[in-house]
Amino acid sequence: MIDFIDYLLGGISSGAIIALMALALVLVWRSTRVVNFAQLGQAMFTTYIALTVRELTGSWFLGLIIAMAAGLVVGVIVHFLVIRPVKRLDTSGAIIATFGVLIALEALAAMVWGGDPEAFPPPINNSGYEAFGRIWPFSPYDLLVLASVVVLVLALSVVFTRT
C-alpha cells in the first residue's frame, strides 16, 4: 500500500508538470488556432539558458528572468517569421513548420550545450516530507507546482469563459 501511495504522489507531481505544458499549448491554440509544437523546444531552450545563467551567476531568480525574456523573444520570432506567414496559406503547413522549429531548436541546443540532458535545480526544497517514520516523496516543490497548476487552470478557465 505504501508503494502505491509513493507512486500516486510521484504521478501527481509529474502530471502537474505535464499539465503546465498542456496549458501553454492550449493558450497558444486559443489565440492562433495553430498547435505550436515548437513550444516544447522553446521551453527546453530557455531552460538551458536559465541553467547557464544560474551556473554563471549563482542566481536562480536571474536565470528565471533572463529565460522568460528569451522565451518572449523566441516566441515572437517564431510567431512572426514562421507561424504567421505559413498560417495564411494553410493551417497544417503552420503545424508542420512548428515541428521544423522544434527540430531546429533541439539541434541548436545540442550544438551549444551538448547532447546530454541536464536537470534544472528547483527553487525550493525538493526532498520529501518526513512523517509517520518514513520519508514521503511529495516535496514542497511538488506542492508549489501543483498549486501553480491549479491557480493557472482556474485563471484560464475564467479568462476563456468570461471574455
Regions found by a protein language model. Give the residues of each.
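Small-residue-rich transmembrane alpha-helical segments that form helix-helix packing/gating elements
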Residues: 1-32, 37-163
